[in-house]
């Protein structure tokens, strides 16, 4: 091979070598670019995944908070219903007892009137009078067990909560505005007025 041909051959080999190096460099750059893109994509997916996890955690917290609030409201409503039911039962019981007690008052009045009208001087009437007295005493003992009390005190200060003034009189023996006499007894039920005592009051 001549010197000229050898030079041409060497130049051709050199060009081919440079071409191969260029291709290899381009391949390496392409691989690096693809790796960088893959890493970027992976980071983006990770950020999205973390954001989704954060969103789900917030939703879970909100759901738990809503459930707790609903449970608290339900418990409060149950307690309110229980309290209202208990109050209604107590009111119904008190109303029924009060109504029943009011029905008994005329019976007590009639027994007392019968005793007042009876001839206590007549010996033949004594057994009947004693029977009336025992009946009245038993009756009063029975109603006291349910909280009924008699308002019949004299010489006490007039109390508009339990007394009803029927008349005013001058009475040197009593202080002003005091009960002189009881015309009709009053009654209370567990501290609540059933019927005021009708009284005569001193001026």
Curated annotation (Swiss-Prot):
Pfam families attached to this UniProt entry: GrpE
Keyword Cytoplasm attributed: yes
PROSITE patterns in the cross-refs: GRPE
Signal peptide segment: none
Composition bias type Basic and acidic residues, residue spans: 1-20
Oligomeric form and interacting partners: Homodimer.
Family: Belongs to the GrpE family.
Protein's UniProt name: Protein GrpE
């Amino acid at each position: 091979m001549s010197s000229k041909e050898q030079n041409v051959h060497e130049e051709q080999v050199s060009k081919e070598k440079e071409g191969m190096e260029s291709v290899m460099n381009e391949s390496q750059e392409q691989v690096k670019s693809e790796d960088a893109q893959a890493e970027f994509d992976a980071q983006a997916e990770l950020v999205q995944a973390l954001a989704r996890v954060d969103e789900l955690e917030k939703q879970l917290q909100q759901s738990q908070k809503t459930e707790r609030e609903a449970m608290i409201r339900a418990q409060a409503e149950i307690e309110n219903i229980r309290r209202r039911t208990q109050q209604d039962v107590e009111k119904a019981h008190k109303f029924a007892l009060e109504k029943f007690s009011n029905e008994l008052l005329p019976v007590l009045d009639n027994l007392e009137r019968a005793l007042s009208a009876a001839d206590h001087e007549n010996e033949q009437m004594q057994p009947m009078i004693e029977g009336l007295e025992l009946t009245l005493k038993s009756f009063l003992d029975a109603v006291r067990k349910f909280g009924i009390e008699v308002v019949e005190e004299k010489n006490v200060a007039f109390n508009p909560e339990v007394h009803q003034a029927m008349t005013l009189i001058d009475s040197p023996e009593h202080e002003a505005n005091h009960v002189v006499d009881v015309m009709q007894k009053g009654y209370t039920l567990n501290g609540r007025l059933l019927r005021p005592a009708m009284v005569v009051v001193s001026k």
